[in-house]
UniProtKB/Swiss-Prot annotation:
Transmembrane regions: none
Keywords: Amino-acid biosynthesis, Histidine biosynthesis, Hydrolase, Methionine biosynthesis, Multifunctional enzyme, NADP, One-carbon metabolism, Oxidoreductase, Purine biosynthesis
GO biological process: L-histidine biosynthetic process; methionine biosynthetic process; purine nucleotide biosynthetic process; tetrahydrofolate interconversion
Family, similarity comment: Belongs to the tetrahydrofolate dehydrogenase/cyclohydrolase family.
Catalysis performed (reactions): (6R)-5,10-methylene-5,6,7,8-tetrahydrofolate + NADP(+) = (6R)-5,10-methenyltetrahydrofolate + NADPH; (6R)-5,10-methenyltetrahydrofolate + H2O = (6R)-10-formyltetrahydrofolate + H(+)
CDD domains xrefs: NAD_bind_m-THF_DH_Cyclohyd
Pathway this chain belongs to: One-carbon metabolism; tetrahydrofolate interconversion
Protein name in UniProt: Bifunctional protein FolD
Keyword 4Fe-4S found: no
Length: 298
């Protein structure tokens, strides 16, 4: 048996297109397309590439983007002032502050100033509270993308055994809560978990999200399981030539693909879904602000 590859790029393209369709409907009532504002502080190369991809996909879907760049020397007060200005701007529906921020800026304080109704990354305390309480709200993009891919692969997730490796507020914890919303049985594993390989072998759905290259080995995955690899790691690839690198996930793809039921590749799996869910959240935020909740359900 060879695993089915879950094509995150193709599914993300469907969501982008749907976001564009709904955004076009909203434009007539808003007088403009839904708008995403992205704040980038400093010159981190990976963040720069990611922001450019976000802006490109946003505009390709027919939505509007605003990109605000500040130097790494910008003060915390300056960044908070930008966030508050965007909060007050009726022409902005979603706000995203690209992380990581420079070390002298308190990320929690900056994120905490984002209007929860414009929090398209789903990271404010209000957004987290809505998720924990099961109330409607904007959900964190990467975890939401994981759940959507799992549903595309397996259908109804009710009763499925899910093991999430990692307990970060960005992926691990919200992913666990989102799978619980789908009536799955969820276990969160972490660095203190005893006998992690045995625990992983119980999973119908395995979600490694720790940033450790190929940590999950082939014999950690039971036959037929669905592996949603959130990790994206750059490692040396001497076979490609001196100084060359390649991207790998947190799961050892070549060891797993032969007996898993479903698996996301890296790249091309979870990554594209993160931006797709960001566009979806931007449109949802715009629909709710326009008092058209029916358009927020897609």
């Amino acid at each position: 048996m060879s695993a089915h590859l879950i094509d995150g790029k193709a599914i993300a393209a469907e969501i982008d297109a749907r976001a564009g369709e709904v955004g076009a409907k909203l434009a007539s009532s808003l007088g403009r397309p839904p708008c995403l504002a992205v704040v980038l502080v400093g010159e981190d190369p990976a963040s720069d590439v990611y922001v450019r991809n976000k802006v490109r996909r946003t505009e390709a879907a027919g939505l509007t983007s605003i990109e605000i760049r500040k130097s790494a020397e910008a003060t915390e007060a300056e960044i908070i002032a930008i966030v508050e200005r965007l909060n007050a701007d009726d022409g902005v529906d979603g706000i995203l502050v690209q992380m990581p921020l420079p070390g002298h800026i308190d990320t929690n304080r900056v994120i905490g100033r984002i209007d929860p109704d414009k929090d398209v990354d789903g990271l404010t305390e209000v957004s987290a509270g809505r998720l924990v309480l099961g109330k409607p709200g904007l959900r964190p993009c990467t975890p939401a993308g994981c759940v959507l891919l799992a549903e595309r692969a397996l259908g109804d997730l009710s009763g499925k055994s899910v093991v999430v490796i990692g307990r970060s507020i960005l992926v691990g914890k919200p992913a666990a809560l989102l799978f619980l919303e789908k009536n799955a049985t969820v276990t969160i594993a972490h660095s203190r978990t005893a006998d992690l390989p045995s625990l992983c072998r119980t999973a119908d759905i395995l979600v490694p999200a720790v940033g450790r290259p190929e940590m999950v080995r082939g014999d950690w995955v039971k036959p037929g399981a669905c592996v949603l690899d959130v990790g994206i790691n750059r490692i040396d690839a001497p076979e490609r030539g001196a100084g060359k690198t390649r991207l790998v996930g947190d799961a050892a793809f070549d060891e797993i693909v032969g007996h898993a039921g479903w698996i996301t590749p890296v790249p091309g799996g979870i990554g594209p879904m993160t931006i797709a869910m960001l566009l979806k959240n931007t449109v949802i935020a715009a629909a709710l602000r326009a008092k058209q909740p029916a358009l927020a359900d897609f």
